[in-house]
């Protein structure tokens, strides 16, 4: 059975999921890394200290995923959403994302803003199926010193290093 719970403090299972989320994000940049549970715990503690709404999904009392929302001027952003591999394609992400939409609705809004890596094809497809088809903003920055950029992404007529 799937259950969503509000998170008020970090436990080991949640810290581990955050660590694996960071590993997955790095993989979109072609980087291989190992999960760092201490860093995952610290990241989640920062979200909670900042008052971000955080929810975890439990499936048969096992932690299956989580969503972190940021509310800024009554606009809801999904800061991160993660589902463990073995629980994917079972409605967990949909339930978590619906919770973010529920928060947005409580402010009178009918959309959630989502941060997505441009080559995170699974998340983009997930969002498209939920009706999220509008590209809102892109984030552009200078390369970091010694950063190795290995891909390019085209948006409209423009090509960007990634």
Roles of regions detected by a PLM:
Residues 2-5, 22-44:
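Conserved GNAT-fold acetyl-CoA-binding loop/helix
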Residues 114-123, 145:
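Conserved beta-strand-loop-alpha-helix junction that forms the acyl-donor binding cleft
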Residues 70-79, 88, 135:
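A conserved beta-turn-beta hairpin within the catalytic core of GNAT-like acetyltransferases
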Residues 62-65, 122, 134:
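Glycine-rich acetyl-CoA-binding "A-motif" of GNAT/NAT acetyltransferases
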Residues 42-56, 65, 77:
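A short helix-loop-beta-strand connector motif used in the catalytic cores of GNAT acetyltransferases and
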Residues 83, 89-102, 121, 125-129:
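Conserved acetyl-CoA-binding loop-helix of GNAT-fold acetyltransferases
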Residues 1-19:
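A short beta-loop-alpha structural element at the N-terminal edge
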Residues 104-116:
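Conserved GNAT acetyl-CoA-binding A-motif
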